[in-house]
From Swiss-Prot:
Gene3D superfamilies: Glycogen Phosphorylase B
Gene behind the chain: gtf3
Protein name, UniProt field: Glucosyltransferase 3
Function as written in the Swiss-Prot or TrEMBL entry: Required for polymorphic O-glycosylation of the serine-rich repeat protein PsrP. Catalyzes the second step in glycosylation of the serine-rich repeat protein in this bacteria. Transfers glucose from UDP-glucose to the terminal GlcNAc moiety of 3-O-(N-acetyl-alpha-D-glucosaminyl)-L-seryl-[protein] which results from the first glycosylation step of PsrP (using the short substrate SRR1-GlcNAc). Has weak hydrolytic activity against UDP-glucose and even weaker activity on UDP-galactose. Does not complement deletion of the gtf3 gene from S.parasanguinis strain FW213.
Binding site for UDP: T16, R179, S250, H251, K252, V253, S254, T255
Species per Swiss-Prot/TrEMBL record: Streptococcus pneumoniae serotype 4 (strain ATCC BAA-334 / TIGR4)
Length: 336
């Protein structure tokens, strides 16, 4: 019996999708998982026969009765994913479905796909969901899989020697401003530094600097010099589900914490309570409140918080959340 894990290729190097799947693969390889590479492509170019042959090639290293962690979705469409699931089940492969995103819940226009995704989730022997809220929502939609694990936090593996964060009353935001209209109008006194090539500041914005996209190594080093990491909602964007942000977990949270700095998140974020309870950051319901949190912080409080985060960031750096998930998932395969 061998262990396998799918890993996506073919998207832009700065894609969160690619970065997340590649990070899981890197961590899983330390536990003996073998990579099953899947290339992102336009499935419309395949006839049913060609897709079938493509999947046979992808599955060539998998034997009857093996264990596969399927990082979901592949972004090749549910037809591709569903056929792969069916072929794996024909080979009596034990499937651990590691959900990164639930496509029918991301955008209102995709909700019609819910039955197709539930079909795959319900075929899974073990399901890994992002949060307790997502677990509850999927069960309301018709999820019947009994063995369900909750991820809770993304890891962010790296081999860098980071700085010790200095106390700075400034905010960082790593992400496209196009998806966060509120931040394009930033007008608080606290400086906001944005690392993105997408989106522009409005004419009324102040204390806002857009510094361009940075590679992961550059970003972590810059963040680790000190300040606060900001995570914000996308509720103003047409077509995006208002609830999705409350169900999924944020990669940005892990990036900031891995760099060793406190985070400020919306209270609606699925991990908000955990962040506050663990002393890793703060909740805020408005950008004015975000500014007030930073403005009222003092050196002693900041150092106490970053000392706490230093211990937690080691877990993310070394991939312990993912390692525990994968070990627990395999354990649950063997027990009733």
């Amino acid at each position: 019996m061998k262990l396998h894990l799918t890993n996506l290729y073919g998207m832009a190097g700065d894609s969160t999708v690619i970065l997340a799947q590649n990070a899981v693969q890197k961590i899983a390889s330390q536990l003996g998982f073998r990579e099953v590479g899947i290339y992102f492509y336009n499935i419309a170019s395949d006839s049913p026969s060609e897709m079938n042959k493509r999947l046979d090639g992808i599955m060539a290293s998998i034997s009857i009765g093996d264990i596969l962690v399927f990082q979901s979705p592949t972004w090749n469409g549910f037809e591709f994913d569903r056929l792969l699931f069916d072929k794996l089940k024909d080979m009596q492969v034990k499937i651990i479905c590691f959900i990164h995103d639930v496509v029918p819940l991301m955008f209102d226009s995709n909700y019609y796909l819910m039955k197709d995704y539930l079909y795959m989730y319900n075929l899974s022997d073990v399901l890994i969901v992002p949060s307790e809220r997502m677990k509850t929502r999927l069960m309301e939609e018709g999820l019947t899989t009994k063995k369900i694990l909750v991820q809770g936090m993304w890891d962010h593996p790296h081999d860098l020697s980071l700085y010790t964060p200095a106390f700075k009353k400034e905010l960082f935001f790593a992400g496209s401003l196009e998806r966060f209209p509120d931040l394009q109008n930033w007008s608080q006194d606290t400086p906001l530094r944005v690392f993105s090539n997408k989106g522009e500041a409005s004419s009324s914005a102040r204390s806002l600097s857009i510094e361009g996209w940075k590679k992961d190594e550059e970003l972590l080093l810059e963040l680790s010099k000190g300040g606060f990491g900001l995570v914000w909602g996308t509720h103003q964007n047409e077509g995006e589900s208002n609830q999705y942000y409350t169900l999924n977990i944020s990669h940005k949270v892990s990036t900031y914490l891995t760099a060793g700095i406190p985070v400020i998140v919306p209270s609606s974020l699925s991990t908000a309570k955990f962040i506050v309870d663990q002393g890793l950051g703060f909740m805020a319901d408005s950008l004015e409140e975000v500014h007030e949190i930073v403005d009222k912080m003092n050196l002693q409080e900041y150092q106490e918080m970053t000392n706490r985060i230093k211990t937690f960031s080691y877990l993310l750096k070394e991939g312990y959340f993912t390692k525990k998930l994968l070990v627990d998932a395999i354990y649950h395969l063997g027990i009733d």
